């Protein structure tokens, strides 16, 4: 059994280099919610050094609230913004001798695209226009995954180790107090259930089917690094190979 382990990088956390030694894919902030040309270049260099798959992490234009502000933008505007961000990272990756392999939207862009087919189509078409070989990463079972499939892209369905799920398969909003799983043991148990049994227990107790191609871990704080190490160890014990797909 194989699974990808991904993390968001270039967002101002001090643990990026250490985290890159634990994951198989990196989603690099492209400047709209965090990061700049220098952080993008450094993240790309580290990813190449550690053999980690490089991906773009585009966002709504929202540096003030870290890309977590809901926005109602015309699809053509979102299309242009995503193309702009992918182009910036692709140029840096090319200059450093690497290959950009995937795209994972950030924050509210990701969450809204999970539910809004028009927004999801705009993102998928932008990815296809930049490079149809790029993989599109989205919430498992979401509109973004369906949009990627309609566009003829290879999609990767994502699950979250430390986020609680609702009965419809969406994430519990961060604005709610139980959105995050604080217990490492519970997060590990949830992740193994998603990867091995293709199901996740929602907060109402129901079991929801889910496809886990890639698992997201968050990298802010020393605790996050310890959890990522525990997750890698758990995968090894269960004979699950961590690799970009």
From Swiss-Prot:
UniProt-recorded name of the protein: 5-oxoprolinase subunit A
Organism listed in the record: Yersinia enterocolitica serotype O:8 / biotype 1B (strain NCTC 13174 / 8081)
Subunit organization: Forms a complex composed of PxpA, PxpB and PxpC.
Pfam families in UniProt: LamB_YcsF (PF03746)
Top EC group: hydrolase
Role summary: Catalyzes the cleavage of 5-oxoproline to form L-glutamate coupled to the hydrolysis of ATP to ADP and inorganic phosphate.
Annotated GO biological process: carbohydrate metabolic process
Family (UniProt): Belongs to the LamB/PxpA family.
């Amino acid at each position: 059994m194989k699974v990808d382990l991904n993390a968001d990088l270039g967002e101002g956390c001090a643990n990026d280099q250490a985290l890159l030694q634990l994951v198989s894919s990196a989603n690099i902030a492209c400047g709209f919610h965090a990061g700049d040309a220098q952080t993008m270049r450094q993240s790309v260099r580290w990813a190449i050094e550690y053999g980690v798959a490089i991906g773009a992490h585009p966002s709504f234009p929202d540096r003030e609230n870290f890309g977590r502000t809901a926005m109602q933008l015309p699809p053509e505007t979102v299309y242009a913004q995503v193309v702009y961000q992918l182009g910036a990272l692709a140029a840096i990756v090319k200059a450093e001798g690497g290959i950009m392999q995937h795209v994972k939207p950030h924050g509210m862009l990701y969450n809204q695209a999970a539910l809004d087919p028009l927004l999801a189509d705009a993102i998928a078409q932008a990815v296809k226009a930049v490079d149809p070989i790029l993989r599109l990463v989205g919430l498992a079972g979401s509109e973004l995954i369906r949009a990627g499939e309609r566009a003829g892209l290879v999609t990767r369905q994502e699950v979250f180790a430390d986020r609680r799920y609702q009965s419809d398969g969406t994430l519990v909003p961060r604005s709610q107090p139980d959105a995050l799983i604080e217990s490492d043991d519970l997060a590990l148990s949830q992740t193994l259930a998603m990867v091995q049994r293709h199901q996740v227990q929602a907060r109402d107790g129901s079991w929801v089917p889910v496809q886990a191609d890639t698992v997201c871990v968050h990298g802010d704080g020393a605790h996050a690094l310890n959890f990522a190490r525990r997750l890698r160890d758990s995968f090894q014990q269960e004979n699950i190979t961590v690799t970009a797909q």
